[in-house]
Amino acid sequence: LEPELVTGMGTAADMENVAIESLTYKELTVTAIVTGGIETNGGRVGDPADYYKPAEKPDKLGTINIILILDMPPGTLARALVTCTEAKTAAIQELLAGSNYSTGLATGSGTDQTIIVANSDSELYFEGAGKHSKMGELIGKTVTKAVKAALSKQSGLNPKTQHNVFRR
């Protein structure tokens, strides 16, 4: 492997609990590969911070990791990342997963990571990846479904277990 062409993600999640979802519309395919667990690190954006530590890297490894594969050139990657993050947050909030640091619902963990893989040679081009576009719809559906599946596999977090108010 050429070091300048590869990347990695760290996680405490069991790789056997990975969730993979893929959707296709006409010539467009979106695939989400997700590992996840937020039972010990789930938090809400804006919660009180655990630390202020200028350093090379934090102590904890990533917990909700998403690899999003898009069959398109990298022109709309920034918006695709926003849509992916919104979908992850929607999945967590639909599961009513609480923050471990405040009384709010979690929006993720403190160490989430996302990698978007785009085909730079693709002849497909889309003007956007937001909620009003088909690309955004596919990103939203694949990521939401994969995040829910990964959290259920890794942590047992699913609508059935969250139905009991005493568990939440």
Q: PLM features: what roles do these ranges have?
A:
Residues L1-R168:
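A structural signal for small-residue-enriched, beta-sheet-centric alpha/beta enzyme cores
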